[in-house]
Amino acid sequence: DYLMEPDTLMGNAAVLYAAGDWDKWTIGLCNYDGINYGLFYSDWHLENIIKQLVTEVERLQGRNILIGECGHASRAAHDFIPTFMGKEARPVYNFMEYTLDCLRRGKIKLDPTIVTERVTYHDPCNIARSGWIVDQPREILRSFVPDFVDMAPKGEDNYCCGGGGGLVSIDELHDYRMEIAGKVKAEQIERTGAELLIAPCANCKKQLKEIVEHYELPCTVMGLHDLILRAIEIPGGRSPAERKEEAALFAM
């Protein structure tokens, strides 16, 4: 996200700032990458990387671990920090859980007049198959997106993007990813008629962007917090409508 999806991180920061938690968070310099390759091939590496993450949290004296829009990193931390750290484990949250909590408590406001496009949502396998993160993003989207439409099937039964398990990083498998799983996913996306496809996972975003380009689908792939960044009201800042007007001028 630092290199490929900066708007996602900007959306994260905007939520923290608007919620009044601007001075309560940080990003660890010694363990800023949430990828845990041990999840693919080695329990020993899985445990070692988890302990490196926990060591960094302890160095920073953090009370909670907040994972951004990455299905892999979220699952690795959420499922295996308690496994390996036991009673010493810090609570782990996906950023969408934090954002929804802020929304419910009235700590942030999202302008429902900003997003006029039809929006749909893709469920990343790593956070949806277990039923952990399914309803939260939909509740957030419905709070400020007038034209939200779900995929079919959805939630735990949603189709994989086709790039999971490391496949998205293998260029030699591009044709396979596009013509097998990608074809099914493209047809599913097309049926929604969506102009914006929300995918809160870097792996999924890369695969879905390639699918959209390959099948020439008329939609844009982005993260949930990319979209939130458009509509969030920033205390003391310009309104979402003013920011939208400015963005339109730059796009001309």
Model-identified regions with their sequence ranges:
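Iron-sulfur cluster-binding electron-transfer modules in prokaryotic oxidoreductases
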Residues: 1-252
